[in-house]
Amino acid sequence: MIHPEEVERLRGVNVYLIGMMGSGKSTVGSELAAQLRFQFFDTDGLVEQVGGSSIAQIFAEHGEAYFRDLETQVLAQLSSYTRLVIATGGGIVLRPKNWSYLHHGLTVWLDVAPELIWQRLKRDPGQRPLLQTPDPQAALYKLMQEREPFYAQADVRVPIRSETSPPQLVEQIWQAIRARLRDGIPS
């Protein structure tokens, strides 16, 4: 249970959810925002709005670098506000410039077991441009390995090793945030 007086300890900063595609950032982000009484934004959805097409189309027509530029632009705009929960794209951690925005808030890494992410993503791999390879599972595991050191820079790590309902995951995230708040918000 999230109490309003505890939320005040966040001092109006944003909560950035980071982690691999399929980790549940968008699903749990809206519920976390509702409980915190913050607004929720999903950078992928905003990139689609700014880019005027789906992420898959943006990748196909303009390439990954263009997509990452749009992602940075969206993140820069969101970081000028406070009291937001922001579900970020899985690769947002790759650009040092993005960390300059992420560090203005509290970053929470949803560290989901690789097998669990694969189980989720294989239901609909066509929506994931970076998995359009002959061996999408190997591509996923390679991406996870490459990105883990970046994700590990998060202020809070929430290990997820089995399917968890969104309300349970929100509680798990909140407990991890509370523990981090006891140590002080990073600056």
From Swiss-Prot:
Binding residue positions for substrate: 44, 68, 90, 147
Pfam family name, one: SKI
GO MF annotation terms: ATP binding; magnesium ion binding; shikimate kinase activity
Binding-site list for ATP: 22-27, 128
Co-factor binding details: Binds 1 Mg(2+) ion per subunit.
Matches recorded under PROSITE patterns: SHIKIMATE_KINASE
Catalyzed reaction equations: shikimate + ATP = 3-phosphoshikimate + ADP + H(+)
GO aspect biological process, one term: amino acid biosynthetic process
Transmembrane residue ranges: none
Binding site for Mg(2+): 26
EC number: 2.7.1.71
Cited InterPro entries: P-loop_NTPase, Shikimate/glucono_kinase, Shikimate_kinase/TSH1, Shikimate_kinase_CS
Cofactor section: Mg(2+)
Intrachain disulfide bonds: none
Primary site of residence: cytoplasm
Pathway where it operates: Metabolic intermediate biosynthesis; chorismate biosynthesis; chorismate from D-erythrose 4-phosphate and phosphoenolpyruvate: step 5/7
Domain of life: Bacteria
Entry function: Catalyzes the specific phosphorylation of the 3-hydroxyl group of shikimic acid using ATP as a cosubstrate.
The protein's assembly and partners: Monomer.
Protein name: Shikimate kinase
Organism: Synechococcus sp. (strain JA-2-3B'a(2-13)) (Cyanobacteria bacterium Yellowstone B-Prime)
Encoding gene per record: aroK
